[in-house]
């Protein structure tokens, strides 16, 4: 086969191996995530941090395992959503180490947006560099389908699938390149949901 005129890394992350965290490990993740939530500088005064978080399937990339999370928090001005991720190093036959976390919040909620078909969050966690100035943002994406019948989620760049995962307990995690540079027009990720018949149910940009 001839050289690819547009060499883009595809399926750069390990697929989920453990699924949604639970039990004591979920508690360990929660301690780390709660601590970083308390450090959000512009979090309104009076917001009560939740005791539990909704975790999403883990993905591994760049020597770390990434676990997204979300939670609702009540404050004096109404309900907020906390979102972010915990990452750690997992060595075979050893306990996880080097826990790190990132968190932010939003007052834009899915239930207030009837037109949404996917409730999405994303965070750039790295950068890929190619030849001749080509580059892209390594992006962790997690979310929930807001339509019935979704069994899988995919990430696409210019109609080409670059990551995919089954939906587990109504949640999914993707990890792929976004915002490609120096390929002519900039190329951005599109997240799609699919049913068991491989029919597209929804398509959303990270920039909607």
Could you say what each language-model-derived stretch is?
Residues 47, 65-67, 86-91, 108, ...:
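Extended aliphatic helical segments
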Residues 134-208:
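Ser/Thr-rich low-complexity repeats and stalk/linker segments
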Residues 1-121:
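Long, contiguous interaction/targeting segments characteristic
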Residues 57-64, 133-135, 167-168:
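Short, ordered beta-strand-loop transition motifs
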Residues 108-142:
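Extracellular ectodomain segments of secreted/surface proteins
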